[in-house]
Structure formats: structure tokens, C-alpha cells
């Protein structure tokens, strides 16, 4: 398998100086960068490279394969002072640095909150449901079990190959909610506090490997199914 080299330099900055960046390329953790340092890493060649400074789907950059063996990436801290600071990704081309495009999640997040998922294409619906699940499951499983999209979410997780969470949800439903009509309503949530608490404990106990698999699966879905100018700019 052919590999390419990524040389990723984190420009020194005061904002967030003490926080290391966990770098992911195409969903795989490749290393950590401290303030003012460089990470050199070889990754398998791909048509698209999706870069992140964490695994929470907040900031990213996208590189289309340009048939080169070296990619020199610069991470700059932007914002801060009176606004939240965040990272921007640049690619060095000889004497210039060009900001990289990124995959934009706003349209998919808005579709969930505006209850308009059905207006998205099938592949977009899968992303919206899985993205919403990734946020909800980190807080409390009752958000997942009370969602009107519960059955669609499970199917979406199956579609992208997030099988650990599919198995965990199946186990939770079978063990704690097998005689309950889902999704849960407010009254059921109050009555089933113990079951919800036990379900949360089970999810949290297994969330490391399950979330890693989910993260990789979502990134793979993005790079394979949604890599078009409507989403990347």
C-alpha cells in the first residue's frame, strides 16, 4: 500500500497554548501536537484526506489528492480575546499558504433541530442522524431513547457500520426496556429512572471503543458519499 507524508506544524499561539491537539486523518488518530511543534506522519494514500484536531466534528479540513507524496500543513489559532478561539488549517505551497476548505455540518445539524431531515437525500439523512446521535449519546441515553427518530437512527448506524453502538442499543432495549413502547415519553422517563441510569452506565463503560468506531464510520461516510462542493468549501 502506498503512503504519503503529512508534516503538520502547529504555529505557536497564546490561545489554547497548554492544550495538545489530537490529530486525526480520515478518522484515524495519528498523533498529538503541542504548541509550536510539528507532527510528521505517514498515512495510506487516499482520494481525499479529512483532517481534524479532535474527534468531535467541530473543526476539520479537506485535501483532495494532488498526486504528491508530501503535504505540509500549518495549523493557526484564530479568534479569541472576545470570541471563542478555533483552529484554521493551511497548506504550504512553496512560498504561499492557502487555507484549506472544510466539510460544513451546519445544514445537517439544522435539519435535525428543524425536524426537516426528510428534505435531505438518503446519504445526507444518514449523516444527520448519526451526527445527532454522536452528540446525544455523550450526554444521556434518554435523549436517544426519547427521540422520534430512534428506529431511523439505529438503521443509520447500521448503514455506516457503527456496529458497537447498534449492539449496545439493542442490549439496552432488550434488558431494560423490552416491555416499553419506544420512543420514551416524559412520563416514562420519570418512571424508568433506574433503567435509564443502568443503561447509561452500560453505555459509558463501553463508550471508548464504540465512539472511536462511530467517529471513523462517520468520517468514512463523509469522504465516500458526501464529498461534493455543496458540503466542502
Enumerate the predicted regions with their spans.
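Extended, alpha-helix-rich binding/interface surfaces that flank or overlap catalytic cores
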Residues: 60-63, 95-152, 156-233
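Short loop/turn and low-complexity linker motifs enriched in small/turn-promoting residues
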Residues: 1-100
Amino acid at each position: 500500500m502506498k503512503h504519503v507524508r503529512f508534516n503538520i506544524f502547529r504555529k505557536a499561539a497564546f490561545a489554547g497554548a497548554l492544550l495538545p491537539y489530537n490529530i486525526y486523518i480520515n478518522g484515524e488518530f495519528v498523533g498529538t501536537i503541542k504548541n509550536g511543534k510539528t507532527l510528521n506522519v505517514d498515512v495510506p494514500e487516499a482520494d481525499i484526506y479529512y483532517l481534524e484536531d479532535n474527534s468531535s466534528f467541530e473543526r476539520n479540513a479537506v485535501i483532495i489528492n494532488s498526486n504528491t507524496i508530501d503535504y505540509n500543513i500549518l495549523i493557526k489559532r484564530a479568534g479569541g480575546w472576545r470570541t471563542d478561539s478555533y483552529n484554521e488549517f493551511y497548506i504550504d505551497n512553496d512560498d504561499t499558504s492557502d487555507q484549506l476548505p472544510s466539510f460544513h455540518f451546519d445544514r445537517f445539524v439544522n435539519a435535525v433541530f428543524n425536524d426537516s431531515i426528510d428534505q435531505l437525500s438518503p446519504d445526507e439523512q444518514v449523516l444527520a442522524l448519526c451526527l445527532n446521535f454522536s452528540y446525544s449519546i455523550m450526554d444521556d441515553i434518554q435523549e436517544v431513547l426519547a427521540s422520534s427518530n430512534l428506529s431511523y437512527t439505529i438503521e443509520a448506524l447500521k448503514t455506516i457500520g457503527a456496529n458497537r453502538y447498534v449492539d449496545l442499543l439493542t442490549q439496552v432495549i432488550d434488558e431494560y426496556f423490552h416491555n416499553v413502547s419506544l420512543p420514551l415519553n416524559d412520563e416514562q422517563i420519570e418512571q424508568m429512572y433506574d433503567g435509564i441510569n443502568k443503561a447509561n452506565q452500560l453505555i459509558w463503560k463501553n463508550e471508548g471503543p464504540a465512539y472511536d468506531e462511530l467517529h471513523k464510520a462517520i468520517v468514512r461516510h463523509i469522504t465516500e458519499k458526501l464529498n461534493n462542493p455543496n458540503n466542502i468549501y
